[in-house]
Amino acid sequence: MPKLKTKSGTKKRFKLTASGKVKRGQTGKRHGMIKRTNKQIRNKRGTTIMADADAARVIKNFMPYA
């Protein structure tokens, strides 16, 4: 049986931490910044850790060798 490929969109969007958690970028900063408060915009910087239930789905379906 051939090797499974990791989804190319998953490679670009997610990284695994050393402890096996899934790190992802923050959502909600593509457009419409004028209506958001400065605090909201500031708190959306950087990355965050994905929830366990969602992370399990990402790893199982899209990252076969993670």
From Swiss-Prot:
GO terms for biological process: translation. It comes from Parvibaculum lavamentivorans (strain DS-1 / DSM 13023 / NCIMB 13966). Belongs to the bacterial ribosomal protein bL35 family. GO terms for molecular function: structural constituent of ribosome. The keyword Membrane does not apply. It holds the Pfam family Ribosomal_L35p. Keywords: Ribonucleoprotein, Ribosomal protein. One of its GO terms (cellular component) is cytosolic large ribosomal subunit. This is Large ribosomal subunit protein bL35. Coiled coil: none annotated. Gene3D superfamilies: 4.10.410.60. It comes from the Bacteria.
